[in-house]
């Protein structure tokens, strides 16, 4: 993929951290549908880093990554100054 593909600006974001999985999944799909219908190409999903979880590991991040893989969407961790491992940038072409 070209460098310009990854440098595209984030159009919108949703903060899912502090939600339970089922609630996060519903919110995620609603957000993705809306972003797609608005013609957005790159969005950010905030999952949190897991600092408030019992074992200090993110519960939502691997869950959301699994959904993204299932949906065959391109994604990566946000840049360090934009959320780092607590956020995922998603391309929805």
Identify the meaning behind each predicted range:
Residues 1-93:
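Long, charged, low-complexity intrinsically disordered regions
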